[in-house]
């Protein structure tokens, strides 16, 4: 239990929100068990059911997860009293034992100490697939958040640097998370893998009169696709980088949805995310929005491969995720940019005008020296 996070609501126990929230996640798992018995899946990105094009990152305070309301902690940590009480009221509504389970946990004076997972660290020689397994293992150890209250508010319009600060806070607090939080955390934990491309993949499915939303972090390493993520179901989260094409990866998720009687309606694919944690660019969450029913099977597959090809072209041309960071770093004259500059010059050496301008650079030095002498 991290220090300094203790909140004591009036008339409640002295258990801290962080420790009790983690305990509540385990207790609320019993409430989810009946749903799994009827093959009801409730994974979501946080958008309201029955409404298709609303802003997913903003929305209302009372959002819906496949028809079941859930809340977002917009006050940060430590959790304020109003959010704390609202969470417990919601737990009492969705748990089979109602208020009894809430009173039992909040009234306990000897809550077990929840172990805090260690953030994975890697040797330079550790293969990327092994690193991905370690990252996914860490995400899984945080556990899925069953409380009905998302602890970290994620605004998709925030610059990448702000989202990375939030991910760092997730590792510090070690609270249960949902799928969107897992994507941000996955980006943060893979920033040190420059040969790994990361991009968001969102799913919208339909089951029993309700829409469900889910998101994972797609990855591409060595031409093979995989994914990192968090879900109530094992086959809707981690996928090792073993799929030859993007369409194979997405269709594998569709098959997993089919096993729990969900119909895939839409897939949203984002562009590759920069590896610079200080980048001020925004994540492009939905570069391609694919309507599965309208496209048909063959066109759906073609559009997936078209998106994959577009990502490769942007990275190859240098217009992919690192571009805004490169332009920003050129003004700062960082050592890293100086090392990569010769590569850019070589790529431009075929252009005659730029080649003719190079000899003019030393001529500018005497003028600069003369200016210094005059001063």
Curated annotation (Swiss-Prot):
Quaternary arrangement and interactors, per the entry? Interacts with SVBP; interaction enhances VASH1 tyrosine carboxypeptidase activity.
Asked if the record carries the keyword Nucleotide-binding, the reply is: no
* Disordered: annotated segments: 1-69, 309-375
Record key words, sorted: Carboxypeptidase, Cell cycle, Cytoplasm, Growth arrest, Hydrolase, Protease, Secreted, Ubl conjugation
Concerning PTM, the database record says:
Ubiquitinated in vitro.
Q: Which Pfam families match?
A: Vasohibin
Q: Which residues form the active site?
A: 179, 214, 231
Enzyme Commission number, as recorded: 3.4.17.17
Q: Which residues form the signal peptide?
A: none
- This chain belongs to the protein called Tubulinyl-Tyr carboxypeptidase 1
Q: Which gene encodes it?
A: Vash1
Tissues expressing this chain: Expressed at low level in proliferating endothelial cells at the sprouting front but highly expressed in nonproliferating endothelial cells in the termination zone.
* Catalysed reactions listed for this entry: C-terminal L-alpha-aminoacyl-L-glutamyl-L-glutamyl-L-tyrosyl-[tubulin] + H2O = C-terminal L-alpha-aminoacyl-L-glutamyl-L-glutamyl-[tubulin] + L-tyrosine
Compositionally biased intervals (Low complexity): 1-33
Organism for this UniProt entry: Mus musculus
Q: Where is the composition biased (Basic and acidic residues)?
A: 347-361
Substituting residue 179 to A results in:
Abolished tyrosine carboxypeptidase activity
Family named by the database record: Belongs to the transglutaminase-like superfamily. Vasohibin family.
PANTHER family linked to this entry: TUBULINYL-TYR CARBOXYPEPTIDASE 1, VASOHIBIN-1-LIKE ISOFORM X2
Q: What class of enzyme is it?
A: hydrolase
Q: What does this protein do?
A: Tyrosine carboxypeptidase that removes the C-terminal tyrosine residue of alpha-tubulin, thereby regulating microtubule dynamics and function. Acts as an angiogenesis inhibitor: inhibits migration, proliferation and network formation by endothelial cells as well as angiogenesis. This inhibitory effect is selective to endothelial cells as it does not affect the migration of smooth muscle cells or fibroblasts.
For bias kind Acidic residues, which ranges apply?
53-63
Molecular-function GO terms, alphabetical: actin binding; metallocarboxypeptidase activity; tubulin-tyrosine carboxypeptidase
Compartment(s) = Cytoplasm; Secreted
């Amino acid at each position: 239990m991290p220090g300094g996070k203790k909140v004591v609501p009036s008339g409640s126990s002295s258990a801290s929100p962080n420790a009790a929230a983690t305990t509540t996640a385990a207790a609320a798992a019993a409430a989810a068990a009946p749903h799994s018995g009827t093959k009801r899946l409730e994974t979501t990105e946080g958008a309201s059911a029955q409404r298709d094009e609303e802003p997913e990152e903003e929305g209302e305070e009372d959002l819906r997860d496949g028809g079941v309301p859930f809340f977002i902690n917009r006050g940060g940590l430590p959790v304020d009293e109003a959010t704390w009480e609202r969470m417990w009221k919601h737990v009492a509504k969705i748990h089979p034992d109602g208020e009894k389970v809430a009173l039992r946990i909040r009234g306990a004076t000897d809550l077990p100490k929840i172990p805090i997972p260690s953030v994975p660290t890697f040797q330079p020689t550790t293969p990327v697939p092994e690193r991905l397994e370690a990252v996914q293992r860490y995400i899984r150890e945080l556990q899925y958040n069953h409380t009905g209250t998302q602890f970290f508010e994620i605004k998709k319009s925030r610059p990448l640097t702000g989202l990375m600060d939030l991910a760092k806070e997730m590792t510090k607090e070690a609270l249960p998370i949902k799928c969107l939080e897992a994507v941000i955390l996955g980006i943060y934990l893979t920033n040190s893998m420059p040969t790994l491309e990361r991009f968001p993949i969102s799913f919208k499915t339909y089951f029993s009169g309700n829409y469900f939303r889910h998101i994972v972090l797609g990855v591409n390493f060595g031409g093979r696709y995989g994914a990192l993520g968090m879900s109530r179901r094992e086959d809707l989260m981690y996928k090792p980088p073993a799929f030859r094409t993007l369409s194979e990866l997405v269709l594998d998720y569709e098959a997993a949805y089919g096993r729990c009687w969900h119909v895939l309606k839409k897939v949203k694919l984002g562009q590759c995310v920069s590896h610079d944690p200080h980048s001020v660019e925004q994540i492009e969450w939905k570069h391609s929005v694919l309507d599965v029913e309208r496209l048909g099977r063959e066109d759906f597959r073609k559009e997936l491969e078209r998106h994959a090809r577009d990502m490769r072209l942007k990275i190859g041309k240098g217009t992919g995720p690192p571009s805004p960071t490169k332009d920003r770093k050129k003004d700062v004259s960082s050592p890293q940019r100086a090392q990569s500059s010769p590569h850019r010059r070589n790529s431009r050496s075929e252009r005659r005008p730029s080649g003719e301008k190079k000899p003019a650079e030393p001529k500018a030095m005497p003028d600069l020296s003369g200016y210094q002498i005059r001063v």
